[in-house]
């Protein structure tokens, strides 16, 4: 009817009315021939009625539909049904939804982790999105948290799956006193935005506005964050914007089925990454659509969940400059401009938010980013492992500090081998066999780590001398590269060991 849609405004019109919007203009200016919405509100029946058939707004490049007479307290599942005449029909969820239903994995989530989950609809096909008009407003006990040591925080990197026996955000909440008493200033959660499946490191994201149900409900995440704030600890999210999986709606909407990757006309993704580090589908960060999406997502996480900062994964890949292994770390002015833009967006939403990049580029580029107030990961694993094993060669700690203390130094991370394991395998003399000696060596490492000015990060259980390999299986009985991202042994019993507890 010629109505123009503002895709930036809230889609909740009133207590019973919602407008859904789907942008589908490709890089050549083309769009799908038709679009419908299937959902609980129309019994998943494909019709040309006003509660199913979407209207076209060419000026905005999108399809839209307004749904009336809805129940404000009910969760509605829905999908878009789009296609071209004589071509492929696609059913996909909404990229901006805050909850999804996954028929292949939801049944594996324990009720204790996600109670009363909405049942998957009979009319659905694949992942479906969910909305509810009336938001579940959360009563924050600490509405305006401020970090105690923003310049030199001690950050604890945590993977929820491998931190407690129930693998959940609620389980982690029960351990906050342990972390607080240890002196932790901030907890950095490995990716918790919806990823493919339930068992993952989380670097395979598909829905960025929904937090993964495998760890808990939105309220449980907020309970955890609020409890951290009450205890004086910040919460940092590890976010992945270098890429997304093929389940991400922006990827599915413009997909090359023959080549099993994003199509050439996709306005969000590259068909092939210009850099050598990509996995899954590579975002084109020079696209205004991608920039807008990422900024909107960052602001949402800051506002809705009161996150205190972000660790950006693989920022070296935020570029359209073609490179190889030999040149990817070279100074890239275009990449710097993109990253500064995202940093500015975070600061505009929350002026005291921490921004950390996993960058690993040449010194000039990292120094320019550091001058903006951005922190950068500084990998000291090799040197500290050498020291832990009792070997002098390559054990220098000089790379931990620069005149500008913007490097987040770490001895271990989720992505590096554990010092305790290396001690048992390649330690010098008695270090291989004697636990008290190993622990004393790790304590010496800590003394030459935490006394250096600047932000510091420790990997979970490193404080107890965790000595299972990064490539260990769940039982700790086998070590192989195939187990790298698999579940790991959870050893809270270490804390009952007087020698380990001393560390």
Predicted feature descriptions by range:
Residues 86-142:
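Extended, polar beta-sheet/loop recognition surfaces of beta-rich domains
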Residues 74-78:
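Exposed beta-strand face motif in extracellular beta-rich ectodomains
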Residues 193-194, 199-204, 229-231, 314-416, ...:
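Active-site-proximal helices and loops of the catalytic beta/alpha 8
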Residues 20-73, 83-105:
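Aromatic-rich carbohydrate-binding modules that target alpha-glucans
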Residues 28-30, 71-72, 147-152, 180-181, ...:
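Extracellular/periplasmic catalytic domains that process cell-envelope and extracellular macromolecules
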Residues 97-101, 110, 115, 136-150, ...:
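Substrate-binding/active-site clefts of carbohydrate-active enzymes
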Residues 1-31, 121:
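Non-catalytic, glycine-rich low-complexity segments
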């Amino acid at each position: 009817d010629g109505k123009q849609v503002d895709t930036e405004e809230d889609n909740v019109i009133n207590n019973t009315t919602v407008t859904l919007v789907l942008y589908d203009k490709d890089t050549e200016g083309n769009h799908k021939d038709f679009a419908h919405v299937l959902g609980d509100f129309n019994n998943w029946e494909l019709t040309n009625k006003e509660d199913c058939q979407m209207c076209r707004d060419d000026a905005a490049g999108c399809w839209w539909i307004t749904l009336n007479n809805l129940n404000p307290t009910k969760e509605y599942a829905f999908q878009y049904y789009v296609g071209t005449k004589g071509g492929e029909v696609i059913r996909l969820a909404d990229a901006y939804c805050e909850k999804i239903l996954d028929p292949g994995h939801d049944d594996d989530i324990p009720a204790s982790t996600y109670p009363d989950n909405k049942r998957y609809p009979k009319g659905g096909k694949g992942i479906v999105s969910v909305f509810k008009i009336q938001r579940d407003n959360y009563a924050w006990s600490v509405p305006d948290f401020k970090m105690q040591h923003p310049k030199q925080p001690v950050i604890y990197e945590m993977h929820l799956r491998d931190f407690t026996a129930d693998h959940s955000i609620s389980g982690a909440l029960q351990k906050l006193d342990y972390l607080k008493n240890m002196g932790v200033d901030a907890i950095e959660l490995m990716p918790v935005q919806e990823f493919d499946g339930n068992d993952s490191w989380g670097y395979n994201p598909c829905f960025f506005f929904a937090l993964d149900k495998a760890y808990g409900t939105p309220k449980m995440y907020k309970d955890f964050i609020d409890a951290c704030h009450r205890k004086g600890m910040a919460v940092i999210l590890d976010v992945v914007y270098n890429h997304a999986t093929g389940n991400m709606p922006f990827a599915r909407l413009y997909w090359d089925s023959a080549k099993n990757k994003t199509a050439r006309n996709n306005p969000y993704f590259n068909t092939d990454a210009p850099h050598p580090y990509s996995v899954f589908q590579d975002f084109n960060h020079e696209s205004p659509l991608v920039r807008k999406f990422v900024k909107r997502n960052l602001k949402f996480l800051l506002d809705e969940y009161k996150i205190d900062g972000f660790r950006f994964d693989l920022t070296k890949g935020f570029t359209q400059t073609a490179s190889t292994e030999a040149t990817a770390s070279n100074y890239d002015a275009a990449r710097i401009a993109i990253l500064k833009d995202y940093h500015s967006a975070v600061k505009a939403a929350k002026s005291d938010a921490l921004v950390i990049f996993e960058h690993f580029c040449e010194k000039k580029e990292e120094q320019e980013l550091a001058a903006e107030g951005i922190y950068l990961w500084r990998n000291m694993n090799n040197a500290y492992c050498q020291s832990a094993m009792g070997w002098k060669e390559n054990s220098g700690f000089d790379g931990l500090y620069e005149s500008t203390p913007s490097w987040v130094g770490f001895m271990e991370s989720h992505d590096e081998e554990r010092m305790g394991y290396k001690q048992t395998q390649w330690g010098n003399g008695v270090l291989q066999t004697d636990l008290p000696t190993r622990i004393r060596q790790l304590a010496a490492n800590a003394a030459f780590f935490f006394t250096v000015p600047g932000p510091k990060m420790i990997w979970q259980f490193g404080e107890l001398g965790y000595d299972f390999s990064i490539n260990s299986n769940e039982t700790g009985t086998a070590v192989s590269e195939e187990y790298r991202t698999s579940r790991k042994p959870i050893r809270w019993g270490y804390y009952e060991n007087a020698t380990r507890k001393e560390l």
